Amino acid sequence: MANPKLVLAYSGGLDTSVAIKWLQERGYDVIACCLDLGEGKDLDFVKEKALKVGAMKSYVIDVKDEFANEYALIALQANALYEGKYPLVSALSRPLIAKKLVEIAELEGAVAVAHGCTGKGNDQVRFEVSIKALNPDLDVIAPVREWSWSREEEIEYAKKHGIPIPVDLDSPFSIDQNLWGRSNECGILEDPWAAPPEEAYELTASLENAPDVPDVIEIGFEQGVPVTLNGKAYPLAQLILELNALAGKHGVGRIDHVENRLVGIKSREVYECPGAITLIKAHKELEDLTLVREVAHFKPIIEQKIAEVIYNGLWFSPLKDALVAFLKETQKNVTGVVRVKLFKGHAIVEGRKSPFSLYDEKLATYTSEDEFDHQAAVGFISLYGLPTKVHSIVNKQNKASVPTGQ
């Protein structure tokens, strides 16, 4: 009788390499799955390593465009920053990884999927909730959570089974990266008082090493979608990667954040998101120009909720779908160009224009070109302040009629 098949989310690192052998010992034929999310990893090497360790098959799938257009774009249009800081780098990729795991499992006739998450992070929740939403019949196995080995025990197991030890194993940091940014934790970063060492960063220059001359760029949007950079059209994934290089050179997008994890603990994380931060700032400025006041004031409530829903692993939920439906409606007129200066860690918006601009210079100006009806303000103020005026009159009358105590 053939062994049951299992699809493993494979990164090429020690944990998921050891997981292949560990799962085989438990009777599974392991199919490795690695996605290209724009992190710049040597995926041919990863594919061959999975097969060398013992996977019966190894998938490598380029999902950069899908990730940019269907996941990162929603976060951008929501100006999504969890707790006002984190652009949801890892949180955005997990539902897409889960989706591909399920697709391959169904294609291969697998009975289970597995991931390499620990028992104290958010990702285990994101993966497992997403997988069960997409296919409730699949079993989900978390080898790292189950085996509870020390790092030394894991290395010993790897040596015993001839599993290659990564050359960067001595690095104290735990890193996750995709085209939307890079997250870094562990090592000295676990001390919230300790300054992140420069070796913790890869995508961004320090302020000291950033150029002394700014770059001024122009980002074009169509219905909330970034489509051009300095007048040149790019697919969204490529545009984000181009911005990572441009803004990263100037130190834009470094984030040092003590965040509240879904599992109940606080965690100190260091993020680099040069492209994401630059795009969010530009997009928000274009919205300020094109959204009516009521939508502009209400949308941040939806934005905060979308950020929480994504962070908490509820991508495939009815609530997320409903929130995104509102979000998409707001983007119909978010078309135009934003000019941004990149300099010493800052993305500074210096100009914005749109064919749907609600800014009317003849109404806003204080020059002789002014077309605003100043006399209309008299009646407006009277009606606007009427409830407050009536309240004040009634209170004064009641106070006057109340006898003072002896």
Swiss-Prot record:
Which CDD domains does the protein's record reference?
ASS
Summarize where L-citrulline binds, as residue positions: 86, 122, 126, 174, 183, 259, 271
Q: Record's InterPro entries?
A: Arginosuc_syn_C (IPR048268), Arginosuc_syn_N (IPR048267), Arginosuc_synth (IPR001518), Arginosuc_synth_CS (IPR018223), Arginosuc_synth_type_1_subfam (IPR023434), AS_cat/multimer_dom_body (IPR024074), Rossmann-like_a/b/a_fold (IPR014729)
> Can you tell me which family this protein belongs to?
Belongs to the argininosuccinate synthase family. Type 1 subfamily.
List ligand-binding residues for ATP: 9-17, 116
How would you summarize the oligomeric state and partners of this protein?
Answer: Homotetramer.
A Pfam family (short name) is Arginosuc_synth
**NCBIfam families in UniProt:** argG, PRK00509.1
Q: Which organism is it from?
A: Geobacillus kaustophilus (strain HTA426)
Q: Which principal EC class is assigned to this enzyme?
A: ligase
Record's protein name: Argininosuccinate synthase
Pathway assigned to this chain's UniProt record: Amino-acid biosynthesis; L-arginine biosynthesis; L-arginine from L-ornithine and carbamoyl phosphate: step 2/3
- Single GO BP term: urea cycle
Kindly list the positions annotated as binding L-aspartate: 118, 122-123
Catalysed reaction per UniProt?
A: L-citrulline + L-aspartate + ATP = 2-(N(omega)-L-arginino)succinate + AMP + diphosphate + H(+)
Keywords in alphabetical order, please. Amino-acid biosynthesis, Arginine biosynthesis, ATP-binding, Cytoplasm, Ligase, Nucleotide-binding
Q: Mind listing the GO molecular function terms for this protein? A: argininosuccinate synthase activity; ATP binding
Entry's Gene Ontology cellular component terms: cytoplasm
Q: List locations, semicolon-separated.
A: Cytoplasm
